[in-house]
């Protein structure tokens, strides 16, 4: 089980990214638009830099929904390999069958 503080920190980052996502996208569009004057693009860049650092999507870490483990994460199921094995052995994931040959 991961530390509760690191899981909560990641959840706060997710909320900030959702909150500031449209504003960040609008500012980035202004910055990348070559037809805009340089001063306007520079002001947009300063506004983007003034936003909270944790509002960037890149700072979000994929974590297991069951254990909070940050590594060996299966995106499709949102669980780690260890939780996947436990849930699969208990028959809680539909369609997952233990292999035998």
Swiss-Prot record:
Residues 1-21 are annotated as: Disordered. This is Small ribosomal subunit protein uS14. Part of the 30S ribosomal subunit. Contacts proteins S3 and S10. Belongs to the universal ribosomal protein uS14 family. GO terms for molecular function: rRNA binding; structural constituent of ribosome. SUPFAM superfamilies: Glucocorticoid receptor-like (DNA-binding domain). Keywords: Ribonucleoprotein, Ribosomal protein, RNA-binding, rRNA-binding. Binds 16S rRNA, required for the assembly of 30S particles and may also be responsible for determining the conformation of the 16S rRNA at the A site. The keyword Ribosomal protein applies. One of its GO terms (biological process) is translation. HAMAP family: Ribosomal_uS14_1. PROSITE patterns: RIBOSOMAL_S14. One of its GO terms (cellular component) is small ribosomal subunit.
């Amino acid at each position: 089980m991961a530390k509760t503080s690191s899981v909560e920190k990641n959840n706060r980052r997710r909320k900030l990214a959702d909150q500031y996502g449209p504003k960040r996208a609008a500012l980035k569009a202004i910055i990348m638009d070559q037809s805009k004057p340089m001063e306007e693009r520079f002001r947009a860049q300063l506004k983007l830099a003034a936003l909270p650092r944790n509002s960037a999507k890149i700072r979000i870490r994929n974590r297991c929904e069951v254990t909070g483990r940050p590594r060996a994460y299966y995106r499709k199921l949102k669980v780690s390999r260890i939780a996947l094995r436990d849930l699969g052995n208990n028959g809680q994931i539909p369609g997952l069958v233990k292999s035998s040959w």
